[in-house]
């Protein structure tokens, strides 16, 4: 039995609240159960130096956690003067994941900044950030199209992400903190709307996992991401 009482293949209650803030071209509050992340997509003219003159855009991401998003307060990384390794790893993952869904030529020489700020953490903050940032990105592209700054939609498809793991020898979907902290295997999976894999991150926390368990976890993730993408489509009115 899972601590939450969910079935092994059941997502937490999921929501995408669009236009959550007024200034960003795209903003979404995404909630996976008690994990809540504010995702914004900001558009700026210009690209990094290595892309200047190439007629294509860029997308990058930043990730942070509010000091009291967790059970005990964590100091701000800005106060310490540098980002931690976990933060750098997660924001690179978010950027990689969403770049896979963008036609950079259609974007022109513009940069999209995705900012993912964790308001409340209960496991799965990186996967929630990816799923929420994708919806914010769609709204930013809609802004560019409606203001006639671009002619063609740069989005090649939606992207969803979810965690899976072995909890008490059972494959489970969308781990919360109670499960994640006691999981024998933890895996994060990112996929496109078309069913392609963008990222698979998996590691054994205790005993090694088998090929059969790995296949079961990936199937669980694939089905869960299908549900997440349907929820994104509903939120977007597609």
UniProtKB/Swiss-Prot annotation:
GO BP term, pick one: rRNA processing
User: Does the keyword field hold Ribosomal protein?
Assistant: no
The species this protein belongs to is Alcanivorax borkumensis (strain ATCC 700651 / DSM 11573 / NCIMB 13689 / SK2)
Q: What is the lineage of its organism?
A: Bacteria, Pseudomonadati, Pseudomonadota, Gammaproteobacteria, Oceanospirillales
Gene field: rph
Its top-level enzyme class, in one word, is transferase
Give the PROSITE patterns listed for this entry.
RIBONUCLEASE_PH
Which InterPro entries does the UniProt record give?
Answer: ExoRNase_PH_dom1, ExoRNase_PH_dom2, ExoRNase_PH_dom2_sf, PNPase/RNase_PH_dom_sf, Ribosomal_Su5_D2-typ_SF, RNase_PH, RNase_PH_bac-type, RNase_PH_CS
UniProt: phosphate binding residues = 86, 124-126
Q: What does it catalyze?
A: tRNA(n+1) + phosphate = tRNA(n) + a ribonucleoside 5'-diphosphate
Q: What is this protein called?
A: Ribonuclease PH
Subunit annotation: Homohexameric ring arranged as a trimer of dimers.
Q: What is its EC number?
A: 2.7.7.56
